[in-house]
Regions:
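Sequence context surrounding c-type heme c attachment/ligation sites in exported
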Residues: 1-7, 181-238
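Aromatic- and Gly/Pro-enriched helix-to-coil junctions and flexible linker segments
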Residues: 1-178, 237
Length: 238
């Protein structure tokens, strides 16, 4: 424990802002040339002769480095890539043979649309989101107790992807679902580890509450802002 003199020193320091750097203490606008802090703009599409704007930007970067585009992939390879990325599984023989045999000029667009409408799409992309927000179906720590109702939030995320929920609503529902009528969405806030191995004393329980609140703040920062706010608990962000 701190001595009375040490406690008084801390009180004095807080009272007169001893040691504070005025440049840090004063709030200021973010000054950085990092791309994530720049205003969103629509850049002009490079004129490279490609039909897809993404290919045009890729081609421009390759040209600047004296590189060339890879040959166009075969239909078989494209179908395989599409299913692996969107559903996490390779196409069945029936799917592949049916696509290759079709003479429909719109078969690629139809295949993509069918994949997006399949429930597996939501299951696949929900995994990416749940990993990002530190979702777990157990509490962690020594006891690692199962969370009997965690699946409700997991299924809510899957349904949100399959229903094509607008992103602004998706975010709002997870941060303030209890206010906007999407209570299941707030599972985001408590998806992290929960320490049940704490002593009965009030001090340790209060500390555990602060740890969980800090976890919520850090998860919000890393998920929606791309910034690690957790270090600001002990350090000044610059």
């Amino acid at each position: 424990p701190l001595s009375k003199a040490e406690i008084q020193l801390l009180r004095d320091w807080i009272g007169i802002e001893r040691g504070w750097d005025e440049a840090i203490a004063e709030a200021s606008a973010i000054e950085s040339d990092h791309w994530s802090f720049q205003p969103i703009v629509r850049p002009p599409v490079p004129e490279t002769g490609h039909a897809n704007p993404i290919d045009s930007f890729v081609a421009e970067g390759l040209n600047e480095n004296k590189l060339h585009m890879s040959p166009e992939a075969s239909q078989r390879r494209l179908v395989r890539r599409l299913l692996l990325v969107m559903h996490g599984v390779p196409p069945t023989t029936k799917q592949m043979d049916g696509f290759l045999a079709s003479r429909d000029t719109g078969k690629w667009a139809n295949l993509v649309e069918g994949i997006l409408l399949n429930p597996r799409y939501g299951e696949r992309f929900a995994v990416n989101w749940l990993d990002l927000i530190r979702f777990s179906e157990t509490d962690g720590f020594e006891m690692n107790t199962e969370r009997g109702s965690a699946w409700r939030f997991r299924d809510w995320v899957i349904k949100a992807f399959n229903d094509d929920m607008p992103y602004d609503k998706f975010v709002t529902s997870q941060l303030a679902g209890d206010v906007v009528g999407e209570q299941l969405g707030t599972g985001f806030l408590v998806a992290g580890a929960h320490n049940k191995v704490v002593d009965a004393n009030t001090k340790e329980q209060a500390e555990n509450v602060q740890n969980e609140v800090s976890d919520m703040l850090n998860a919000t920062g890393t998920t929606f802002l791309g910034l690690t706010l957790g270090c600001a608990r002990c350090h000044n962000h610059k």
